[in-house]
Structure formats: structure tokens, C-alpha cells
Regions:
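Transition-metal
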Residues: 1-133
């Protein structure tokens, strides 16, 4: 039987010039004062940005520790790239156009020592006449 339970994580906030403050209103996030927050990383196991468990007996442990110590309970027999949790889940709050982003295919990303990135978006809120392209 698994020793895991429903986990919550401390968000990792990212200041962005195109960000805003709507994550407070929409999700009750307690944002750092007086800066535009463009991203709230909800689950991350990226070097330098690893989510920390916020609740229960494992509070204070990070997601990478969880993957190393409870891999099967957490992920079953899923294959891991570089031994890290396979998803980066974040909320974006963009009040301006986002900076240009280029996501190369996996082969090119590996050549450049980067990560491939397949994205899925869900639009939770938008102002009238907002655009996505």
C-alpha cells in the first residue's frame, strides 16, 4: 500500500514584464508585493526550481526527493527522462504579449542541452477581445 496522500506544493512565482496580479483574484495566491507575476509554477522538478511539498508528514521535502524515494508510488512504471518528474505545471497571467518562445524538437533540444517542450493550454480567464495566436 502506498504511503503517499494527496499532496499540495508551494508555488514558485516568476516575475515577468508581461505579468499581472490576477493570480491573487482567480486562485487566492499570496503573491510577492509590487511586482508583475507572470507565472506560478505549481509542480516543477527542474534544476533550481523544484517544488516543495506544503502539507502532511512530507511537508518540506521536495518533488525530486519524492521521485527518488517514492517513484513507483508516484509514477508507477513510467519512464523518466533524467530521473526527474516529467511534467511542469504552471499558471500564466499575461496582461501583455508574451516574449517570443521557441521550442525545438527533442533531437535539437538535446543537441543544445535543453529540454524538449510539448505544451497544452487551458484558458481559465480572458478579458474581452483578448487574442491568442
Amino acid at each position: 500500500m502506498s504511503s503517499l496522500y494527496p499532496l499540495t506544493f508551494q508555488p514558485i512565482f516568476k516575475e515577468r514584464v508581461w505579468g499581472a496580479r490576477n493570480l491573487e483574484r482567480l486562485y487566492g495566491k499570496k503573491l510577492p508585493a509590487a511586482v508583475p507575476i507572470g507565472e506560478s509554477w505549481e509542480i516543477s522538478d527542474r534544476p533550481g526550481d523544484v517544488s516543495v511539498i506544503a502539507n502532511g508528514p512530507l511537508a518540506g521535502k521536495d518533488l525530486h526527493w519524492l521521485v527518488e524515494n517514492h517513484r513507483v508510488d508516484l509514477l508507477g512504471d513510467a519512464k523518466l527522462e533524467a530521473g526527474r518528474f516529467p511534467l511542469l505545471i504552471k499558471l500564466l497571467d499575461a496582461q501583455e504579449k508574451l516574449s517570443l518562445q521557441v521550442h525545438p524538437p527533442a533531437s535539437k533540444a538535446a543537441e543544445l542541452r535543453g529540454d524538449p517542450k510539448t505544451e497544452m493550454w487551458f484558458i481559465a480567464d480572458a478579458i474581452p477581445n483578448a487574442e491568442l495566436y
